[in-house]
């Protein structure tokens, strides 16, 4: 059994795209150093957080932002169950510490909450939350 899904971070891409355009204008009319630095930061943020890919196989859940510089592997043996949840708007996007535990999310409010055997939780934002939770729970059963 395997699952792989990539969600585009529309809000991140649009916001950073607008930021990049503004930085290009600043670059044209002001200091090259300030404009170039800000433009590079915007482009790096787009590359790093513009998407979230989740893959599940029979041993682990792999999560990576963008091109994979930021990634995490969660062994299935540590997960008790997975359930579909809605995140609160103030949890935001990106990598966040929420009242329910750490959350990785690039867009939207649909998510899967991993319930660890030690009682802690980890939240994965997904526009395919139902299929992701079902896949994780099926992989846990063997």
Predicted regions and their residues:
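N-terminal membrane-targeting/pre-transmembrane regions
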Residues: 1-29, 103, 109-111, 121, ...
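Hydrophobic alpha-helical membrane segments, chiefly transmembrane helices and signal peptide h-regions
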Residues: 18-19, 38-41
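Short, aromatic-rich membrane-interface segments at the entry and exit
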Residues: 30-39
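Transmembrane-cytosolic junction motif
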Residues: 44-60, 64-65
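Non-transmembrane, membrane-adjacent beta-strand/coil modules in membrane-associated proteins
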Residues: 50, 64-128
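Cytosol-/stroma-facing membrane-proximal "stalk/adaptor" domains immediately downstream
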Residues: 128-142
């Amino acid at each position: 059994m395997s699952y792989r899904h990539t969600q585009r971070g529309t809000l991140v891409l649009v916001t950073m795209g607008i930021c990049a355009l503004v930085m290009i204008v600043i670059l044209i009319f002001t200091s090259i150093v300030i404009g170039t630095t800000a433009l590079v930061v915007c482009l790096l943020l787009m590359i790093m957080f513009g998407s979230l890919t989740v893959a599940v196989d029979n041993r682990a859940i792999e999560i990576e932002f963008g091109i994979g510089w930021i990634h995490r592997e969660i062994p299935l043996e540590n997960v008790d169950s997975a359930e579909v949840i809605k995140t609160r708007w103030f949890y935001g996007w990106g990598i966040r510490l929420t009242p329910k535990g750490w959350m990785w999310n690039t867009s939207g409010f649909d998510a899967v909450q991993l319930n660890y055997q030690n009682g802690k939780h980890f939240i994965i934002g997904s526009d395919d939350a139902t299929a992701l939770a079902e896949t994780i729970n099926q992989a846990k059963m063997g």
